[in-house]
Amino acid sequence: MGDAVPWQEVIGRVPFINCDPIFHGLDSKWDILPAPPSWLSGHLIRQDCLTAPIPSADYAAHNDELVLLPDLGIVSRGNVGSVILFGSRPIESMRDIALPSDSSTSKKLLGWILEDRGLDPKTVEMGPDLTTMLECCDGALMIGDRALSAVSEYPSFVQMDLGAEWTRITGTPMVFGIFAKRKDAPLESARNARDDMLRQCEMFEQDERWRNEVIKSSSESSGIPKSRVSQYFDNEVENRLDQDSIDGLEMFLREACGMPGEIEWAWMN
């Protein structure tokens, strides 16, 4: 990103394929700032960007400064495929779990699941490298493209898909990421950004040729086979924030993050 680009023209994104349907082919008037999920909230608050898909848990921590943009998010309705607890033993037997330094929501979600099961293993924050994590701990939490790849490489070490576990317990979708803006960021610019991103999402949903192009690009950038990327977008992750997703988000913010009060939206549809 060049120094001359105003922050009002910058959109943050996670460097994972889970939001490629939103960002692939996005109008070039927007400058894109890629960063790990746990960094995006800081970029947003420091006015490095206009909006970004921040971790849901970070919205709970900064809801006094931020409002949410409607319709878009990073959502699962069962298996998410890319937020995975690995280990050589079941979760009930894990004495310690390594947590990735690049995540916020998945750590809150795992803590909530452990509490729900009456478990209290030691947790250690580490860089997101599965081999190193499992050398140090019984369990390892991984997110994003690394998790997708590791599931294929080490299938016998998969102990839990956290999206599936949330939905099994609550009956609601799990919202891992949500687009937010600062309360004082220009509303019209945020509307324009949301509209452009939503247009890309709709193209992905409705245009088979475009969908295949996005899948091919995501496969090439991540090294994940096209068939697996297609399955991921078909059955696991999606970018639509509907009322069921909002219900799940509200429950996560309240139950797992302890956020008081209601979600504040930048505008209502």
Show which residues each predicted segment covers.
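Beta->alpha turn/N-cap motifs
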Residues: 15-18, 36-38, 48-65, 70-72, ...
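Pocket-lining segment of extracytoplasmic ligand-binding domains
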Residues: 125-215
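Short catalytic helix/loop segments, enriched in acidic residues and glycine
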Residues: 30-40
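Bilobed "Venus flytrap"/periplasmic-binding protein-like clamshell domains
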Residues: 1-26, 80-138, 143-145, 247-250
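Secondary-structure end/capping motifs
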Residues: 186-255
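Hydrophobic residues within well-ordered alpha-helices
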Residues: 43-45, 133-134, 256
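Hydrophobic/proline-rich hinge and linker segments of small-molecule sensing/allosteric domains
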Residues: 68-91, 168-185
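Conserved C-terminal helix/tail region of periplasmic/extracytoplasmic solute-binding proteins
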Residues: 259-269
